[in-house]
Amino acid sequence: MVTVITGGRIERPISVVQSHFVDFEHHVRQKVHPGLALRILSQERGEQRIEQTVKMLGLTLKDELVVRQLPDGSVLETVVAGTNLGGSIHIGFREDGTNATFVYLTVRVPAEGWKARVAPLLKVGLLLAANQTLAEDRRDLEAGNYYPKMSEVTVEPLRTRSTLAT
């Protein structure tokens, strides 16, 4: 297994960033990742199936992923079919100041067959790809291109103070 870990700060609140990382309709519509072809296969409450095609090291890699948001707010993308079967991406989040979020990615890809022979090169390619996709997400979020769906927004009741003397 080849594993890479990376991360970075995004200047948006954690709830917005977490929502962004599971909103594949937005990613497809806005072409957040130009080098990545995404297709939504199915969406059910708590789980999505995504087809992802990318070119890496001169090869076209196609995978089917199951995406779940975990109870702690992190996201787990598990490869259930394709080139990287058995691989995964875990995306974690923590607040980093008032309106910022630190995002960390852990990418795991099985290194069997030809991948075992090029594992060091694969690791470099995975790290570059992970950093690039994180930078694309950061640009999209910090440019104000993303707003969570209203169904995902928690609205606090408006508290008013009576101006009448009692």
Residue locations for each model-derived region?
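Short, highly charged C-terminal tails/helix-capping segments
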Residues: 35-38, 135-166
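Short beta-strand segments that buttress and anchor functional surface loops
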Residues: 49-56, 75-82
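Beta-strand/loop substructures that line and gate deep hydrophobic ligand-binding cavities in soluble
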Residues: 79-132, 149-150
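Beta-strand elements of well-folded, non-transmembrane domains
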Residues: 10-12, 54-58, 71, 95-97, ...
